[in-house]
UniProtKB/Swiss-Prot annotation:
<comment type="subunit">
    <text>Homodimer. Probably interacts with PlsY.</text>
</comment>
<dbReference type="GO" id="GO:0005737">
    <property type="term" value="C:cytoplasm"/>
</dbReference>
<dbReference type="InterPro" id="IPR012281">
    <property type="entry name" value="Phospholipid_synth_PlsX-like"/>
</dbReference>
<comment type="function">
    <text>Catalyzes the reversible formation of acyl-phosphate (acyl-PO(4)) from acyl-[acyl-carrier-protein] (acyl-ACP). This enzyme utilizes acyl-ACP as fatty acyl donor, but not acyl-CoA.</text>
</comment>
<keyword id="KW-0808">Transferase</keyword>
<keyword id="KW-0444">Lipid biosynthesis</keyword>
<keyword id="KW-0594">Phospholipid biosynthesis</keyword>
<dbReference type="Pfam" id="PF02504">
    <property type="entry name" value="FA_synthesis"/>
</dbReference>
<dbReference type="GO" id="GO:0043811">
    <property type="term" value="F:phosphate:acyl-[acyl carrier protein] acyltransferase activity"/>
</dbReference>
<protein>
    <recommendedName>
        <fullName>Phosphate acyltransferase</fullName>
        <ecNumber>2.3.1.274</ecNumber>
    </recommendedName>
</protein>
<dbReference type="InterPro" id="IPR003664">
    <property type="entry name" value="FA_synthesis"/>
</dbReference>
<keyword id="KW-0963">Cytoplasm</keyword>
<dbReference type="GO" id="GO:0006633">
    <property type="term" value="P:fatty acid biosynthetic process"/>
</dbReference>
<keyword id="KW-1208">Phospholipid metabolism</keyword>
<comment type="similarity">
    <text>Belongs to the PlsX family.</text>
</comment>
<comment type="pathway">
    <text>Lipid metabolism; phospholipid metabolism.</text>
</comment>
<keyword id="KW-0443">Lipid metabolism</keyword>
Amino acid sequence: MLRIAIDAMGGDFGPEPIIEGLVLALRKNNNFTAIAVGNKEQLLPLIPQGLLPRIEILDTNDVISMHDNATDALKRKDSTIYKAIELVREGNADAVVSAGHSGASMSLATLRIGRIKGVSRPAIATLMPTSENQNTLVLDVGANVDSDAKNLFEFAVMGQVYAQYALRLDEPIVGLLSNGEEDSKGNEVTKEAYKLLSKLPGFAGNVEGSDIFKGTVDVVVCDGFIGNILLKTAEGVADTIGKIIKKNLKRSLISIAGAVLMRKVFKNLKVRVDYAEYGGAPLLGVKAPVIISHGKSNSKAIQNAIFQAINAASSNLDSIIEQRLVEYSNKID
């Protein structure tokens, strides 16, 4: 049975939504147990009596806050995220979920759990909604500010494997984010990456930013600098559109009546753009599943992040990524 380590104190709102999300996940899935890392006195009252046999509490009080430096994470061995990562490193857990300091989670996972053989740099992946009934996996969205062509090639392989085995897509199509579809477009790094990716099965060529939300391809590859700007921009646009709609709906009785009639449409729209539906962002390229959740995650987001961790841990992703990198690297050397 899978064991999932949970950083129970790392989120912006304390342990309540994290434990609530864990409880939701445990009630819906009987095939895993959890280790909640955090202050035992705070965590124990939040756990229903009937679920105590499936939740072990690893007691610790130190929490790395969003204001702390990620480089301090290695020194603070009693912190919740350090101990959660160590559980995986020592083989006592199969995956980690944290809504805490993303930089600390990433650096600790990379240095303590270690990179998959053949991976130069891990990448953070996230799902973006599309106008179709599907999502687009985008990576990297923040792990690496600077990436070379080989890094982008590795991101593509990792993203393709994740899409195939964790998201259950048969033959994931990969696109390289650029400022035009022609192979002559892009900067020197993306042009060089295009040459490498052209030898990858399922590579569709360059894609533009708008293609992400059209569902043109299944996986979009970019460096972490561009990816993080893309992610924050998408979040901002979605939030702004929501506020504009809400503001205009209150302007007249007719618009209010129209809103009532379109309630189901608005509900479906909210589901499509709500980050809680997607859970968290997997850190691809390390030897065990690490899911980085939004600091403002509610219980639903944590529940879905745990399900992501379970899917990834059940899919043996690390060995598949290693095999694919060996196979495809032979074609580009």
